[in-house]
């Protein structure tokens, strides 16, 4: 297993959102998180990524194994597409941004400042950064927001390539990504007692993307 979660309890601020969450993910496997809006999918991903401490339970994985992509794109607007990828590649100790450029068809945009991109183009750049992290576990929160059908397919192809290389992915999404071997986990049974799934405080978007 590349990641094992045991009896995890998660909180957003002072409110407990989830309890008793247990699952594991193996190399080459994708896990799709399901549940209604506000159920705690974002909170769970933030906790897995180490951005929010768990209230209880354990998360077991190799050190520095997780790359987290949140709702917000978190790009450096003044840098070009290529410069954004180079910046992150340098941080993560990788050298070649060409595979990331190719995977998300960013070559025509390579010299354009990120601040001038459309919403869909920004999302493609944000997701392309996953390929320069070198990290085996991708934790992705609604990754296809702002993507059209063609680029959703590109994203799915990038995930499949990552899985074939021995990586893993945990994805919160409401759409079918076309990943035939992906497992699903409905987190609704893990919603903390007394907290309605519709509570907006339970699961608001993270605005400081880890990537």
Swiss-Prot record:
Query: Would the keyword Cell inner membrane be found if you checked this record's keyword annotation?
Result: yes
Q: How does it sit in the membrane?
A: Peripheral membrane protein
Carries keyword Acyltransferase? no
Q: What is its main location?
A: membrane
Any one GO MF term held by the record is: ABC-type heme transporter activity
Q: Which Pfam families match?
A: ABC_tran
What EC number is given for this enzyme? Answer: 7.6.2.5
Q: Which compartments is it annotated to reside in? A: Cell inner membrane
Q: Per the similarity annotation, which family is this?
A: Belongs to the ABC transporter superfamily. CcmA exporter (TC 3.A.1.107) family.
Name of the featured protein: Cytochrome c biogenesis ATP-binding export protein CcmA
Which species does this protein come from?
A: Jannaschia sp. (strain CCS1)
- Gene this protein is translated from: ccmA
């Amino acid at each position: 297993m590349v990641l094992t979660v045991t009896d995890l309890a998660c909180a957003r601020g002072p409110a407990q959102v989830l309890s008793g969450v247990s699952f594991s993910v193996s190399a080459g496997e994708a896990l799709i998180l399901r549940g209604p809006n506000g159920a705690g999918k974002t909170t769970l991903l933030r906790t897995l990524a180490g951005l929010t401490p768990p209230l209880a339970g354990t998360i077991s994985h190799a050190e520095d194994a997780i790359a987290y992509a949140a709702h917000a794109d978190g790009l450096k607007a003044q840098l070009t597409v290529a410069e954004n990828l180079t910046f992150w590649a340098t941080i993560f100790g990788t050298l070649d941004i060409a595979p990331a450029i190719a995977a998300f068809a960013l070559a025509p945009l390579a010299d354009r400042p990120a601040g001038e991109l459309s919403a869909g183009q920004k999302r493609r750049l944000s997701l392309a950064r996953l390929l320069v992290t070198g990290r085996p576990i991708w934790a992705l929160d609604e990754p296809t927001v702002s993507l059209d059908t063609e680029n959703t397919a590109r994203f799915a192809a990038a995930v499949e390539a990552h899985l074939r290389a021995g990586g893993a992915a945990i994805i919160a999404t409401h759409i079918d990504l076309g990943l035939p071997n992906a497992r699903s986990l409905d987190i609704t049974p893990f919603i903390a007692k007394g907290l309605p799934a519709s509570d907006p405080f339970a699961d608001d978007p993270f605005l400081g993307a880890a990537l």
